Amino acid sequence: MKVATPEPVNLGSVSRIAYFGPRGTFTEQAARALAPGEELIPVETVRQALTTVREGGADAACVPIENSVEGVVPATLDALSESTALVAVAEAILPIHFSVLTRHGGGEIRTVASHPHALAQVREWLEANLPGAHPVASSSTSAAAVGVLDGEFDAAVCAPVAAEHYDLEVLATEVADVGDAATRFLLVRPPGELPEPTGADRTSVVAAAVNRTGTLAELLTALADRGINLTRLDARPTRSNFGEYRFFIDFEGHVAEPRILDALTALRRHCRNLRFLGSHPRADGIRSTVEAGAGNDDFVEAAVWADAVRKGELA
């Protein structure tokens, strides 16, 4: 599997990209794929990457959003739902396999460090090949490599490109419990002009719904009634009142389409707050599924008919 990105989108004035670093992470690879030739600014956390954009220190941020093995990245969901709004304008999907790096002549391996998502994706490999090593969580895969250099850990599970940045020995490559694992990354920036619709787009929102019976069903019905295919649904606690959640919803289509705009209007009616997180081309190029009677022309025709009725032009 190769890096999947859509056709290049117009990034406007984006020239400085903050990313979840340090150097040698998968996120850096995604940032280079999405914004080749632009200045990359490594930061220590996902939240810091988004804060850098919000405070004007970068024009956009590249952050991981979901992995095919471990699911969503909670830190990204939480940070996108807080503070001032940012919107996704592009995405990339990277194949994920790892290298295990050690110090040259480092001896026995007692500790293996990496980001928790990475450790979870090589758990079986570690049990089979380094059964005596204790897994240790680090802030990122490359931070683990730095820890090995500093003598804090004996080995690090990293993106293969990390071996080009850090003077470490490659103990193993192509390490992965699931051979076709992949991670999706977003390029987000402050609200502004959106990418043009392509027919293979993804729209994302975060909904703070009213806490009552049937609320989630109402949100999903707003999409189903308009023939809109859901691609992801996750819930995260609001961290204010116990039992209250925000719903992160991805679905096919672009806000420029009448059916998608109609759905967003319906979602807004059912929510205490609805944050639009962007419409952008899908990296996998899968075109939207449109059911009979749910095409954009159908919505336009229905609106024209209703307007004629309102004006008394139809009996």
Predicted regions and their residues:
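Domain-level signature for soluble enzymes in the chorismate/prephenate branch of the shikimate pathway
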Residues: 1-315
